[in-house]
């Protein structure tokens, strides 16, 4: 029987240990795909911007079009979502280049320079870039006129006045933003076009400055302008600088296409399922029309009337956001507690007598009773909305019912289904509501004729008022609570500098250079899958 001596045993164990170690090294050195790394990490790291569309803190916590898309994408991967919120576009591309984030999820244009260094995902909506001015002020109709206005000087101007006018006429854009690249391309044809870059503001701030008269012109994308007009109705489009451009997410350019391929599949799936259309309807479906006179009156009411009634809206809003109830009340009565209609509805929430009696309101002209009763009536309608409708869209169906009646709303859903639409999508159903006026259609419904077009406009108006109130009271901020994450304050950067055609390359290079030392002013927050 063979016997191992101690020396042989040690050699044997050494050989086995060495073999196992080398095998482990080979396993560890084996490259894994980017997608596998994300799954092993258990976290998808997404960079986005803090604005009204991509990401903000709403009454129910984190929200935004890109936030919801990113959360669904993380769910599909089966990992947590880690959101890194930047305040400037210039921070996002370097973060992606360094590997601090896995993708950029915010509405960025597919500029040639960005596409050269990074890989865009599928386009999920389109925007045009426009020159913005204040309604009633001097309006340039094209770039040639804009340059003429910038360089004009009247005979009566002294040097100080001329300097002030030149500053006001100069376009301002956010430093290291994609608009820097756009204006460089425009300067090739209009070398006298002047613009200033600023470090202490975002695009929304610049639009506000145009509204207040501090600036005469700014550049904005069409959707951003539409959102800003709800608070600054004086803003208007002078002319379009570009045609509609695609916006998309971005990932790193790499031979490894695992993450990119799954992103393509993800957008294809949500496009086919209708989920993408539902989310776009939720966030931008209400911004198509703009009534200057109505918006001006509403902005005045925000300052003069809302402070008086806000406590009651907050007290009786129940499970609803009080700002939504305030928007509903403005649509009904313009916050007039004594409002009356020839049709018999009365009060702040314009209740009919039978409705008031059903919710325990004895005096419809008492604002407290009216608000309490209106909220209770809305709550009952929401409870009747079919469960098949997505939670975030139930309120729009309920508001349509508040206006036109529950039966007519259900008629519109059935009509939508007959026409091949989705009866659970507000975006589809709202387009069928106006058909309830036409005999060709209402003769085939259970409840007959209805002013469905008014119900559609009613809901869209409330949505616009709601977004304006959110912006006005300043509660769409980045920080919701200590649990949401920790924010780092952006240190002030250098003052505005005039960018001429000769030095614009430096600014553009900074925006996309992987080595630029940007301040990491980000909020990092984790979301469970």
Swiss-Prot record:
| Domain of life of the source | Bacteria
Q: Which InterPro entries match?
A: Lysozyme-like_dom_sf (IPR023346), MltF (IPR023703), Solute-binding_3/MltF_N (IPR001638), Transglyc_AS (IPR000189), Transglycosylase_SLT_dom_1 (IPR008258)
Region (Non-LT domain) spans which residues? 28-287
Give the location in the cell. Cell outer membrane
User: What is catalyzed by this enzyme?
Assistant: Exolytic cleavage of the (1->4)-beta-glycosidic linkage between N-acetylmuramic acid (MurNAc) and N-acetylglucosamine (GlcNAc) residues in peptidoglycan, from either the reducing or the non-reducing ends of the peptidoglycan chains, with concomitant formation of a 1,6-anhydrobond in the MurNAc residue
According to its UniProt record, which residues of this chain constitute the active site? Answer: 332
Judged by the first EC level, this protein's enzyme class is lyase
Q: Name one GO biological process term.
A: cell wall macromolecule catabolic process
Locate the compositionally biased regions of type Polar residues: 519-529
Record membrane topology: Peripheral membrane protein
Task: Identify the keywords attached in UniProt to this record, alphabetized.
Answer: Cell outer membrane, Cell wall biogenesis/degradation, Lyase, Membrane, Signal
The UniProt similarity line reads: In the N-terminal section; belongs to the bacterial solute-binding protein 3 family. In the C-terminal section; belongs to the transglycosylase Slt family.
Q: What is this protein called?
A: Membrane-bound lytic murein transglycosylase F
